[in-house]
Amino acid sequence: FDEAHRCVGDYAYVFVAKTYMQQAKDPLILALTASPGGQKYKINDVKDKLFVTNVEIRTRDDSDVKPYVHEVENDFITVELPIAMKSLMTYLVNIKNSRISKLMRMGVIRSNYVNKTQLLNLQVELAKKKQGVSYMAMSIIAEVIKIDHALMLLETQTIHALKQYTDKLSKEESRAVARLEKDDNFINAIRLTNELDAEGTEHPKLEKLVEIITKELQNKDARIIVFAQYRDTISKIYEALSEIKGAAPVEFIGQAKKKGKGLSQKEQSQILNEFQMGFYNILCASQVAEEGLDVVETNVVVFYEPTPSAVRKIQRAGRTARTQAGKVIVLMTKDTRDEAYHWSAHRKEKQMNQTLREMKEGKQITLKDFKNK
């Protein structure tokens, strides 16, 4: 079983493994994954579902692997937001902090530091109480979540993506948005976003990306994947890279969501074939390209933003250095969640390897023991 980390819930592997174990005379299962996850219970869950007994781990530095892997150059490039974008950030941070303070005064939260998952869980708990104060708190939490998303787009993505989001917000009919639209900080944030978008000012990452790709395309055989989290960002990346001499970018995204655009599996397959044949030399890709793709060779992988997930970090980086040396370039915005996400994924990957080594060194059944059972 390849990509064994997918073995959760009702994934087909579970049924196949169970049927095989029931019918095979001498069953023996090998499960492979580059990214099993960092938590022991998750790894054990995969083991149980695939009837796996022993765990083995190999990294690029292990002596029996080293002769067969190619060198990967890792570059981490940090950019700084310009003054106008920092001003915009200040407006958004002021809104978020004022709402967080309200929630603390209401006794709904006890700390200034709450993440999106905690806020969503809190909304669920408040909804169960069905009280006036609870409904008000839920609405304020909605404001925090919306503003934090806007902040994330400003810090890590593009002005274009932020403008698309604020335009969408303005069409929402909710109490949370109605209150935001009366806030001077929000009014100023929208004004500045519109001004920056109108004058063509973009996130410094985009300029740095154009610089990087221009340099990499000096290699006429270059094959490059640029990963980004959001489709609006991918569209802007495609637009910017299309201006580079010798660049032949293409958007590679998942299937359509509601009214949004998307690619069918047939279209995805066609784009990959054309990428391999050289019709395109840059994939501007979403998460759909992170695993399971039969890409012949990619010289360079660019993370437009770091991912906090160790699994996704490994999958993205795994798109290069398959048959020859490769390069992984990670773009980060200074003093933003980009840096936090980068170190989070690094820490999780380190923890994952440690967990696997501990599981490997624990009591395991040998092949001889297995046959004698």
Spans of model-derived segments:
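SF2 helicase catalytic motif II
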Residues: F1-D45, V302
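Helicase motor interdomain insertion/brace
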Residues: A12, V16, K42-I43, V52-K66, ...
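Short glycine-/polar-rich loops that comprise or flank the Walker A/P-loop
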Residues: A24-L28, L50-T53, V72-N74, G246-A247, ...
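Conserved segment of the helicase C-terminal RecA-like domain
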Residues: L28, P36, A317-K348
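Conserved RecA-like helicase motor core of SF1/SF2 enzymes
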Residues: G254-K258, Y280-N281, Q287-T323, K334-D335
